[in-house]
Amino acid sequence: TRSAKLNAKLYAKNLNIVTGRNDVQADSLQATPRAADGSEKPQLAIDSSALGGMYAGAIRLVGTEQGVGVKLAGDMAASGGDIRIDASGKLSLAQASSQGDLKIAAQAVELNGKTYAGGSAEIRSAEELVNRQSLAARERIALEAAHIDNAGVIEAGVEPDERRNARGDLELRSGTLRNAGSLVASRALEAKASQALDNQGGSLKGATVRVDGGHLDNRGGKLLAEGELRVEASSLDNRQDGLLQSRDRAVVKTRGDLDNRGGQVIGLNDLEVGAATLDNGQQGLLGSQQSTRVSAQALVNRGDGEVSGKRVEARVGSLDNRGGKLIGDDLLVVASGAIDNRLGLFSAANRLDLRARSLDNSGKGTLSSRGGLEVSLGGLLDNRDEGNLLSQGAQRVTVGQLDNRAGGLLSSRSELNVHGASLDNRGGVLVADAGLSATGGAFDNRDGGSASGKAGVRVEVASLRNDQGGKLLSDGRLDLAANAVGNAGGRIAAKGDLQATLGSLAQQGGELVSEKTLKVAADVLDNSQSGLIAANGGIAIEARQVDNRAGEISSTSKVAVNA
């Protein structure tokens, strides 16, 4: 028949309905469409009202006439086999259930009620596929359409009594996918949307979850996996409490922007996140209980953003961590460009290793490690205005320039090694509970700057300015080597031996003192105007020229001056 209309219940062992302008083989029901004759097409190939239910062991419906739809408003139940529907137009389906598989192919598909397959469900639509209420299957569900719109529940791995099994896979393939409801798989969930996936307020959940495609909008949405979660997209918007979470491993990569402001991306055992630009600000979270790895050309973690894990590795072009946090037992941060950590925090329980072109840690920025701390910069470390580098273990800072003025602090409960072409510690503090080493070019420790070590101090620089209340102090031995030292009004002191190898020393009103022996080798030594050179042990001075007018060179032991 060309069309069929059902207004009453229809019962059969096997129900086959074939409509359209066809030649149908009686044995196989193979339909061969006839050429169009110009006659008017029916509005619907099959029209089943709410009273027109179909009940059979197996059901097969075929509508071959192009553009002519199938409307099934009544119940459809296949108690012993499959339901197969082929429509060349739009299919509108109300309630359907099969003991076996459900297979649908149509120009467009609209599921308005509850649809269940006791086997697998396979639906293909040339245009759109809409699910308004529920689609469930005991086994696999495979959906393919140009556009998929789910406002209800699509769930694979559901027994007829609604218990969950462990073998339901859900696969969706589309150009665009909109999910305002729930997509659930008891085993693997895979969603591919080549253009865009809109999951605003929706949820995707599976034992494993894979999302692949164009732009992913997960604002207020959830992607949840017990096992691996893998997301690959051109861009991702995970704002407004968006959640991507795996109880195992999560891999999230975008070719463009990843916006996680106020969102969460979590892989409890392992997290890997990669993007061109990654914005994790406004209390965004990238976290793992084990390993977290982040890569981006630009990472923004400001405004209480957090990147955390047992082992955290961030490899970026630039990093804006103003007011943000990077926290781990072991923390490695590598930036080819600049890092801004003003009011930010890098914190490690074991070791913190930071490498970049430059670091702005001023204004109470903090790098803290309960173990070792290493900072390596090609350019400037700006640690002014109460910036802090703190470590319980050894601390090594290698920079082009250090600006530690106005309350900047480099502190180690172990050794502190600082090297730079320029070290500006005016009004700052360098302190080590073990040894302190400062090497490089110009070292400016004026204006109340303090550099001290409890187990010895070694300073080898091109020049040292320790004037105007500067303090260079050692609880042990102090070794000083410089071409020029200015110590007017400053203090250089050691509780152990002090040895200074200098080009020149100008310390009018300054102090160069040791509680043990003091040795000075210099070209020019100016100790005038109340300068003091003193030691409890012996003093040995080798100099070409000594000016001690109104100065003092004294020892409780021997004093030897060779000038």
Regions inferred by a protein language model and the residue ranges of each:
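Extracellular and secretory-pathway beta-repeat/beta-biased strand scaffolds
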Residues: 1-413, 417-475, 479-536, 540-563
